[in-house]
């Protein structure tokens, strides 16, 4: 896809820009973190392949963080059920549920894919107050807007952020929760 091609073309310059902004060189990197999805296939493959190449080239371990975890983390102070959503295209959303815990969020459901209507029905059936975050919530806002006690997070946090991956990957690195390239395929 053209979007995947743009991602491939922009990724290396973006890495160089971040290194420059942080005033560090590539050889100062001790671990490589990567968003492992769910998400659109081409963009994920480009990101994962780049991360594997960098980690292999530097001889450092890797950490994988899911996109849904990355979406839930910025709203970690919310006391409601947090539902991270990603537009899966074709009228579906990837989603997982989270609860606030000391220091972050804990996933309380396995990542799943369903139609927005099915997700809305599940939320209605459980009756919990919830905060929806992610581009799936934005894309299908009309489906979720009618649910009582269900709010949408601000659009500015609808996509995984570099800040979140740094925070979550750092915690995983301290616990030595490393992954191998074959685990990411």
How does the language model describe each region?
Residues 34-62:
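DPxDG-like acidic metal-binding loop motif
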Residues 61-160:
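Surface "functional belts" at beta-alpha junctions
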């Amino acid at each position: 896809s053209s979007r995947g091609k743009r991602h491939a073309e922009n990724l290396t310059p973006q890495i160089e820009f971040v290194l420059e902004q942080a005033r560090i060189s590539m050889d100062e990197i001790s671990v490589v973190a990567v968003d492992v999805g769910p998400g659109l296939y081409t963009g994920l493959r480009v990101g994962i392949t780049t991360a594997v190449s960098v980690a292999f080239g530097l001889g450092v371990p890797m950490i994988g963080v899911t996109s849904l975890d990355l979406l839930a983390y910025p709203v970690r102070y919310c006391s409601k059920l947090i539902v991270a959503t990603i537009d899966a295209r074709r009228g579906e959303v990837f989603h997982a549920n989270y609860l606030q815990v000391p220091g972050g969020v804990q996933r309380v459901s396995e990542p799943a894919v369903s139609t927005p209507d099915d997700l809305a029905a599940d939320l209605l059936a459980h009756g919990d107050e919830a905060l929806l975050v992610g581009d799936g919530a934005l894309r299908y806002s009309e489906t979720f807007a009618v649910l009582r006690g269900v709010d949408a997070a601000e659009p500015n946090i609808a996509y995984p952020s570099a800040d979140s991956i740094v925070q979550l990957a750092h915690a995983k690195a301290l616990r030595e929760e490393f992954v191998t390239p074959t685990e990411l395929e």
